[in-house]
Regions:
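Membrane-embedded transmembrane helical bundles of large multi-pass transporters/channels
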Residues: 1-49, 115, 137-139, 151, ...
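Short secondary-structure junction/hinge motifs that connect adjacent elements
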Residues: 29, 83-86
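N-terminal entry motif of extracellular EGF-like repeats
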Residues: 52
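Structured non-transmembrane domains adjacent to transmembrane bundles in polytopic membrane proteins
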Residues: 58-80, 90-188, 416-604, 608-610
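Short coil/turn segments at secondary-structure boundaries
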Residues: 82-83, 402-405, 453
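N-terminal extramembrane/targeting module of integral membrane proteins
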Residues: 89-90, 384
Length: 729
């Protein structure tokens, strides 16, 4: 017997040394990759595309119109109006001195030098287009429409876009020139708004990432009550983000995928949240197995065997949902699909290779002060989750009916969610200079001044098209684009004709990016196409309208496909059609309830005007794909226990042993997405709240009460059509 014991110990020692070397090699490989990934973090912002082309539908009429409109200017790309607004006593009849000062300023502004590039501002604006001050009828405002050449201004200087620096320079210069004269200045319009968006996205690189890491670290310290253990899952999550960022950077640099600041922000919180979730699951199972195995190598082998299936199934579910975004009309949505999928794949890879290696290297002491000993102590059904399990076991019908009714009540409010889209001025949680300027502009000029609807028509149709468009109730004026006198640089009365076509500018009475402005587009298109079906309607309002329409189309197409894919994955994982349908139904109910709560909170607490048209789709992708994770973690363990002790005991045992870790995982994911709220962007703040609340709802109510109670009520038939359905309850 002693010889057999010695032989067994020798074999165990050989296996242990082999596992130790594998762990060391794994860590070295990850550290090597991390060295390459570090450079990608500092350069990722240089491959972002945050202009309208990053969101525009490829097949939209506004896209086609934009391609034609380029031919009417010497610039290679779209011109972005920067609206310089001056407010005060600017009536030439009563304050000729101030009016003349504005004239002189507009004549000399473009000759000033941008410090960052040491080039004159004229380099970045439309060539041959003078800055002409336009006084308001009430004499209290002057508007200067400066056409920014985005093809030039979008260049990078020292790794940062020069475009926002131009707007910042003009804002500071105008303030310096006019504040002493009692004149208030703003830079608004598309260029001003996008500069503020760039500034908001710029904080994603540092502020968002740092805050997320701090929040995750605090939660891990609270969960593990250990001064050292929290470092391993956090290091693993950071490593996963490093490799994901590196891959995304190189793919975006080669223009294989689209990346914008919004997508990068989502990538950061998604990877840190998902990787930490998977790490919590592995560490909990490893700690459990350390009680049953003297060798930490054997404990890790059994733990990996227990978690690899739910982690891969969970990650595959999220990846499947994200990759369906490739069917989107919007290039920004299509970009999120592969970017998010790379993040989830990196998270799974790190947790299943790097984290086990780290845990093996450090041994049991890493759990100090609560070091798990080899004592073969089974999980006792005690504590909070034992009480929850007993409640579900005693009164399953009362539990699932009450929770389902509560969810249905909140789901009823989902119909009140305003998802008609946000104007650019409503996109910020703070009042930026561009937002204030846009509001003040509407007080003194037609709201659409400086950002007209741009209509491409055949020269022969110009008169009839202008008349038809002018009859649209929201159109203030319609004027044609004319040539510029090369000597005076002033517009002439001669039409600018390119390939037999001309451009009409329709100024709206309403804000061009408002709901009313976007609703004007189908009316203008209808009026114009009655004259000639080949007329193209573009401009900022048309772009906004086309983006909203594509978002609604994506909701109709993508959501059903995602549901079908998740149902198939669940069916294969649980070997049960019934269980898959049940889990999917509960998560959809949870999603609807979350939308209902969002409708109430956004309107009555945060005071948001509504949501972006893409919000329901993004919320659905993350809530359903991530929300189903916790049911996967629960039900795979329930199935494992049901094979041993029956479905009734299995659901109680599964709930009890997974309750703590799943709730912790949900808290981490909710916190990481909640961090999106620190950014001054309404869309990300709303998405962060929706995912955070929805995940907590899933972990605390759906996974803890609704699903276990339903499974307890249904019994072994939940496993239909597998053989497990015939097992005694």
């Amino acid at each position: 017997m002693s010889q057999e014991v010695l032989s067994e110990k020798k074999k165990s020692g050989v296996k242990g040394r082999k596992a130790l070397w594998i762990a060391i090699v794994s860590i070295l490989v990850w550290l090597s990759i991390g060295g390459f990934a570090g450079g990608a973090f500092s350069k990722i912002s240089t491959v972002q595309e945050n202009d309208n082309s990053a969101f525009l539908p490829d097949s939209a009429e506004s896209t086609i119109a934009g391609e034609v409109l380029v031919k009417f200017s010497s610039q290679d790309d779209q011109l972005f109006p920067a609206l310089l607004l001056l407010l005060g006593d600017l009536n030439p009849a009563t304050n000729a001195q101030a009016f003349e000062k504005v004239n002189q300023y507009s004549a000399t502004l473009l000759s000033k030098t941008l410090p960052e590039t040491e080039k004159p501002l004229s380099t970045y604006f439309a060539q041959g287009v003078p800055l002409t001050p336009i006084p308001s009828a009430d004499g209290k405002a002057i508007l200067i429409n400066a056409q920014l050449d985005f093809a030039v201004a979008d260049a990078n200087v020292d790794g940062e876009p020069v475009f926002p620096k131009i707007i910042e320079f003009i804002r500071e210069d105008m303030e310096k020139e006019f504040t002493s004269a009692g004149i208030t200045t703003h830079v608004t319009g598309p260029a001003g708004l996008f500069a503020d968006l760039f500034e908001a996205f710029g904080s994603i690189d540092t502020r968002l990432l740092q805050t997320t890491l701090i929040v995750v670290a605090i939660i891990l310290i609270v969960v593990y009550r250990s001064p050292v253990l929290w470092i391993l899952p956090l290091f693993t999550a950071a490593s996963a983000l490093g490799i994901a960022t590196m891959i995304v950077y190189y793919l975006a640099r080669e223009e294989i995928i689209d990346l914008n600041g919004q997508t990068q922000g989502i990538l950061d919180v998604l990877v840190l949240g998902a990787a930490t979730d998977y790490a919590l699951l592995l560490i909990a199972r490893y700690r459990e197995e350390l009680h049953h195995h003297q060798s930490r190598f054997d404990a890790m082998r059994i733990a990996l065997r227990g978690v690899v299936e739910p982690i891969i199934a969970s990650g595959s579910t999220v990846i499947a949902g994200l990759m369906v975004l490739l069917l989107s009309d919007l290039s920004s949505n299509r970009g999120l699909g592969p970017v998010g999928s790379i993040g989830i794949a990196s998270s799974m890879l790190a947790v299943l290779t790097l984290l086990p290696a780290l845990l093996i290297i450090f041994g049991r002491w890493i759990f100090w002060p609560k070091i798990p000993r080899f004592d073969d102590v089974d999980e006792k059904l005690s504590g909070l989750w034992s009480k929850v399990g007993n409640l579900v076991d005693r009164r399953p019908r009362a539990v699932w009916i009450s929770t389902a009714l509560a969810l249905l009540i909140f789901a009823g409010f989902s119909t009140t969610l305003k998802s008609d889209g946000l104007s650019q001025s409503e996109a910020f949680t703070t009042r930026t200079d561009s937002v204030i300027g846009l509001e003040r502009l509407g007080e003194h000029f037609p709201s659409g001044e400086g950002t007209p609807v741009e209509i491409v028509v055949d020269q022969a149709d110009i008169a009839s098209a202008a008349a038809a468009i002018g009859r649209v109730s929201t159109v203030a004026s319609v004027v044609p684009l004319t040539n510029v006198d090369p000597l005076t640089q002033r517009p002439t009365s001669e039409l600018k004709v390119v390939d037999g076509k001309v451009v009409l500018y329709a100024t709206l009475k309403v804000a061009p990016d408002s709901a009313e402005g976007k609703e004007s587009i189908p009316l203008i298109r209808q009026a114009a196409k009655a004259v000639n079906p080949n007329i193209l309607v573009g401009g900022q309002s048309a772009i906004g309208y086309d983006v909203d329409q594509s978002s609604r189309r994506d909701n109709r197409v993508i959501i059903p496909i995602v549901l079908l894919l998740i149902a198939v994955i669940l069916g294969f994982l649980l070997r049960s059609i019934f269980a898959a349908a049940l889990l999917l139904g509960t998560v959809v109910l949870s999603f609807a309830a979350t939308l209902g709560v969002c409708a109430l909170v956004f309107d009555n607490v945060f005071g948001f005007a509504g949501t972006d048209a893409a919000f329901p789709l993004f919320a659905f992708i993350f809530l359903v794909a991530l929300g189903i994770d916790y049911n996967i973690f629960l039900m795979t363990r329930v199935r494992e226990e049901s094979l041993k002790i029956g479905t009734r005991a299995g659901i109680i045992k599964g709930l009890t042993v997974t309750g703590g870790v799943i709730t912790s995982a949900g808290t981490v994911l909710a916190a990481t997405f909640g961090v999106l709220g620190i950014l001054p962007l309404v869309f990300l703040a709303e998405l962060g709240f929706a995912v955070a609340f929805g995940v907590l709802l899933d972990t605390i109510i759906v996974r803890s009460l609704l699903v276990p109670a339903l499974v307890r009520q249904i019994g072994p038939k939940i496993w239909w059509p597998s053989k497990l359905q015939h097992q005694e309850n």
